[in-house]
């Protein structure tokens, strides 16, 4: 069915609850829990389940009832999606909650969203903290340096996906290799070990990772050689879909100096991407840089004489503007009222400056950025952006913050 240009009554929002109990749940997701007509969920701990059930304004439904030990998981996924869709078709504003990020290794969420959009309903996904995010934090990894390759373990095997020995490699669901139902006995795990040994050798290190869920839980970070993965006592510890393998780089990649020249990077300014802190699990051919080399020491020595640039913009807004923007960001129902009639909403807010009112009535992020920040010089002079400058901000304002890149 072709998508409708006018969404029907009823909507579907899919959100993630994160991995660690409640700690990873976003304010946006909490707002949706409190406002949805019906909430469907799959979570991995009773505390998150209790929070959902106690904060939802409407009925809640545990989608895990559609799992069964001998039941094909894809059948369960289709049923989970259809149950949510049926509620949307009834005209309900439906929230589907999935642990972790709702779009990463989650089939029913994508299926339900696609069908809802195809049938003309409003549908969107809200992000959540994934197991990958959790692992990057716990292991101290940056996927940008030296790059990252991720595969689901079974798909990695059946499609003969390549590992990259010069990047981070992540294998998901290593505790359920070849499993299509809910019986995670992992009898095919040896096939995964065979493949890893073939590609990287028996002595390369692998980190078995499982992020902590409950406050009383402990994160698992166990390091083994690939050969040690064959030990029965190790195999017993890798037996659920929560188990993830981090496979560190073995080698350092060569630099394409021809491309460096084509990119126009001056040779005298170019140096290798810094690799600090060193990767404690990497192979012997993977190089790293010291914490305080010549360039780092020079950067530190400049701190004593650092002067804030004239172009730096600091937060500068009325208390009313700060409050209304925080409220709009954390209260979905309030934002809907704002969008329904911006002029009336803004006029009812006390304490806004006239320019802040104009920006809020425009309803664009660019205009809001412009009235909520200013250089120190403009603040001292009492200079504000003009209406014309706010109009120029009607388009989406792109903010780019580079924290990891080739150093030039």
From Swiss-Prot:
Q: Which GO terms describe its molecular function?
A: methyltransferase activity
Instruction: Explain the post-translational modification.
Output: SveMA automethylates at Val-401, Ile-402 and Val-406 before being processed by a prolyloligopeptidase which likely forms a peptidyl ester upon removal of the follower propeptide, which then undergoes macrocyclization with the N-terminus of the modified core peptide. Peptide backbone alpha-N-methylations change the physicochemical properties of amide bonds to provide structural constraints and other favorable characteristics including biological membrane permeability to peptides.
Return the annotated region ranges for Clasp domain: 251-375
Q: List the Pfam families.
A: TP_methylase
Q: Any keyword S-adenosyl-L-methionine?
A: yes
**Region of interest (Methyltransferase domain), ranges:** 1-250
| Transmembrane intervals | none
Subunit record text: Homodimer.
Q: What is known of its domains?
A: Within the homodimer, the clasp domain wraps around the adjacent subunit to position the core peptide into the other subunit's active site for iterative intermolecular methylation.
Instruction: Tell me the protein's name.
Output: Methyltransferase/ribosomally synthesized type I borosin cyclic peptide precursor sveMA
């Amino acid at each position: 069915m072709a998508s409708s240009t006018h969404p029907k009554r009823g909507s579907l929002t899919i959100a993630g609850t994160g991995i660690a109990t409640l700690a990873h749940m976003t304010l946006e997701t909490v707002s949706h829990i409190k406002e949805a007509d019906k909430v469907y969920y799959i979570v991995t701990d009773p505390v998150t389940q209790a929070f959902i059930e106690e904060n939802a304004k409407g009925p809640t439904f545990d989608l895990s009832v559609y799992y069964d030990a001998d039941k094909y998981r894809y059948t369960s996924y289709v049923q989970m999606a259809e149950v949510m869709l049926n509620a949307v078709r009834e005209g309900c504003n439906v929230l589907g909650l999935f642990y972790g990020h709702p779009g990463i290794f989650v089939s029913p969420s994508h299926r339900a969203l696609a069908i809802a959009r195809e049938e003309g309903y409003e549908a969107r996904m809200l992000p959540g903290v994934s197991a990958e995010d959790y692992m990057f934090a716990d292991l101290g990894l940056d996927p940008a340096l030296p790059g990252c390759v991720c595969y689901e373990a079974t798909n990695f095997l059946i499609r003969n996906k390549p590992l990259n020995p010069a990047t981070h490699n992540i294998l998901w669901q290593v505790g359920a290799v070849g499993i299509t139902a809910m019986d995670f006995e992992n009898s095919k795990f040896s096939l995964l070990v065979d493949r890893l040994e073939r590609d990287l050798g028996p002595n390369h290190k692998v980190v078995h990772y499982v992020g902590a869920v409950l406050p009383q839980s402990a994160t698992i970070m166990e390091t083994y050689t690939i050969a040690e993965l064959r030990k029965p006592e190790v195999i017993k510890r890798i037996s659920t879909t929560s188990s993830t393998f981090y496979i560190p780089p073995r080698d350092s990649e060569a630099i394409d100096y021809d491309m460096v020249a084509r990119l126009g990077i001056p040779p005298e300014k170019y140096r290798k991407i810094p690799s600090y802190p060193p990767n404690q699990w990497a192979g012997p051919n993977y190089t790293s840089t010291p914490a305080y080399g010549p360039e780092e020491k020079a950067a530190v020595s400049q701190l004593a004489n650092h002067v804030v640039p004239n172009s730096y913009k600091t937060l500068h807004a009325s208390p009313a503007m700060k409050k209304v923007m925080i409220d709009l960001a954390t209260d979905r129902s309030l934002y809907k009222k704002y969008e329904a009639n911006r002029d009336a909403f803004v006029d009812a807010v006390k304490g806004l400056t006239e320019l802040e009112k104009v920006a809020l009535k425009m309803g664009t992020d660019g205009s809001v950025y412009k009235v909520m920040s200013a250089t120190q010089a403009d603040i001292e002079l009492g200079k504000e952006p003009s209406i014309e400058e706010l109009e120029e901000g009607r388009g989406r304002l792109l903010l780019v913050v580079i924290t990891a890149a080739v150093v030039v």
